[in-house]
UniProtKB/Swiss-Prot annotation:
Gene Ontology annotations of biological process type: urea catabolic process
Organism in which the protein naturally occurs: Azoarcus sp. (strain BH72)
Keyword field: Cytoplasm, Hydrolase
Primary localization class, coarse: cytoplasm
Keyword Oxidoreductase among UniProt keywords: no
Pfam families reported for this sequence: Urease_beta (PF00699)
Coiled coil residues, start to end: none
Enzyme class: hydrolase
Complex and partners: Heterotrimer of UreA (gamma), UreB (beta) and UreC (alpha) subunits. Three heterotrimers associate to form the active enzyme.
Catalytic activity field: urea + 2 H2O + H(+) = hydrogencarbonate + 2 NH4(+)
Top-rank taxon, per record: Bacteria
Protein name: Urease subunit beta
EC number in record: 3.5.1.5
GO cellular component, one term: urease complex
């Protein structure tokens, strides 16, 4: 082994395996583009995004870490969300939760 070498397991790595997912239709009703990062609590995104916020509580985008989805003005698109993991406590963002989900 070489120092720092990574030896991955054989096969594909499935992101967020075994976690609950949800598919929602989202529309940017604003006049500016809105970008949402991979780990942002989706229910607390920009108010110009129209979707079922109650259903999205406790979920984030089901995309690779460090990436984002951009919603152009007037654009409607379908997104897949994945349940937050760990202690399921949310702090910050828009301050709507500030604790356990």
């Amino acid at each position: 082994m070489i120092p720092g070498e990574i030896l991955p397991a054989d096969g594909d790595i499935e992101l967020n395996a075994g976690r609950a997912t949800l598919t929602l239709s989202v529309t940017n009703t604003g006049d500016r583009p809105i970008q949402v990062g991979s780990h942002y609590h989706f229910a607390e995104t920009n108010a110009a995004l129209a979707f079922d916020r109650a259903a999205a509580r406790g979920f984030r985008l089901n995309i690779a870490a460090g990436t984002a989805v951009r919603f152009e003005p007037g654009q409607a698109r379908t997104v897949e969300l994945v349940a937050l993991a760990g202690a399921r406590k949310v702090y910050g963002f828009n301050g709507d939760v500030m604790g356990a989900l």
